[in-house]
Amino acid sequence: YYIEYTIESLDVERLEQMINLVISKNDALRLIVTHEGKASFLDNVPYYSVPVYSLYDGNDREQKRLERSHHRYNYYKWPMFHFCVGKTSGKTSVLHVDFDCIILDAWSAKLLLNEIFSLYYGKDVKFPRISFMNYMRLKTDKGDLEAEEYWKEKVKNRPSFPKLNYQKKFAEVQNVR
């Protein structure tokens, strides 16, 4: 997922603070995938710094757009999103935003960006009082918990995945779109 915004008189430091606030309130922005293929939500992540580059002409913008719109994330490492700002010689800035769709679909990304911009422009944003994970735990009844424990035990004793022969190693595959 990639989108960019042209913004006049952008305060990058304020934007960065609002992005970090939203990261702290949103489990999906703290998600990584373990080597076992399970989602893991990090409790603590480093402060996210928004890189800034000089935007001299349309070619710089196009180059950044091409780079970010085709970026492939490492699922085992945080973050799986990227914000950066191109600054012109005037007051115009370009905010480039991309996410891996494993953490957010387009609707969720739009909602998240609306939260960031609302906070940036001083509007009040109501964040959920509990995380999605805690909400799901509250909704789960005792029978579901027993069933979950049963299946966790079953999964521990399942056979390993089959070894598949590939024409190339995944690391050798290039230009995937």
Describe the residue ranges of each PLM region.
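Acyl-group handoff/entry surfaces in thioester-processing enzymes
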Residues: 1-43, 57-141, 156-164
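Short, charged/polar, Gly/Pro-enriched secondary-structure boundary elements
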Residues: 43-51
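Flexible, P/S/T/G-rich "lid" or insertion loops adjacent to the active sites of thioester-utilizing
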Residues: 147-177
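Short amphipathic
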Residues: 3-6, 51-54, 177
